[in-house]
Swiss-Prot record:
A GO term from the CC aspect: cytoplasm
Cellular location(s): Cytoplasm, Nucleoid
GO biological process: negative regulation of DNA-templated transcription initiation
Native organism taxonomy: Bacteria, Bacillati, Bacillota, Tissierellia, Tissierellales
Primary location: cytoplasm
HAMAP family documented for this protein: MraZ
Name of the molecule in the record: Transcriptional regulator MraZ
Keywords in alphabetical order: Cytoplasm, DNA-binding, Repeat, Transcription, Transcription regulation
UniProt domain SpoVT-AbrB: residue ranges: 5-47, 76-119
InterPro entries to which the protein is assigned, alphabetical: MraZ (IPR003444), MraZ_C (IPR035644), MraZ_dom (IPR020603), MraZ_N (IPR035642), MraZ_sf (IPR038619), SpoVT-AbrB_dom (IPR007159), SpoVT-AbrB_sf (IPR037914)
Molecular function GO terms recorded: DNA-binding transcription factor activity; transcription cis-regulatory region binding
Quaternary structure (record): Forms oligomers.
Length: 143
């Protein structure tokens, strides 16, 4: 499981260090794709396959399902961690998430999110994201 947040710089080639606590769990190979809220989603191969299976079950006659699948898969990139613990964030994905020099790498259960550091700080400090209010909205999940 991925938890916590880490901050790293991107080098001139678009590479960033995968936090050491995430390396064993993510494995040698993983997928990075467009996420929601202007961030990137990083999935271990097994979680990406599960997501693929779920998306493949959606009806092709639903416009929203087709559109989501297009965005999700067209932005996906298969990546590996090099010997220095780095991986490449392709330019197209850096542009999508408006990633500049520093990133926040966030553990979110079965996936990792990558944010531009400034955007993550704005998001996580947003007063409208009151934790208690968010939890109240999840009453039906019996947490």
């Amino acid at each position: 499981m991925f938890i916590n947040e880490y901050f790293h710089n991107i080098d001139s080639k678009g590479r960033v260090i995968m936090p050491s606590k995430f390396r064993d769990e993510i494995g040698e190979e993983f997928y990075i794709t467009k996420g929601m809220d202007e961030c990137l989603f990083v999935y271990p191969v097994s979680a990406f396959i599960q997501m693929t299976e779920k998306l493949n079950k959606l009806s092709l006659t639903r416009r929203q399902a087709r559109a989501f699948s297009r965005v999700f898969f067209s932005g996906a990139s298969n990546q590996e961690i090099d010997k220095q613990g780095r991986f490449l964030i392709p330019q197209s994905l850096r542009s999508y998430a408006d990633i500049k020099k520093e990133v926040a790498i966030i553990g979110v259960s079965n996936r990792i999110e990558i944010w531009d550091k400034e955007k993550w700080e704005q998001y996580s400090n947003d007063s409208s994201l009151n934790y208690d209010d968010l939890a109240d909205g999840l009453n039906d999940l019996d947490l």
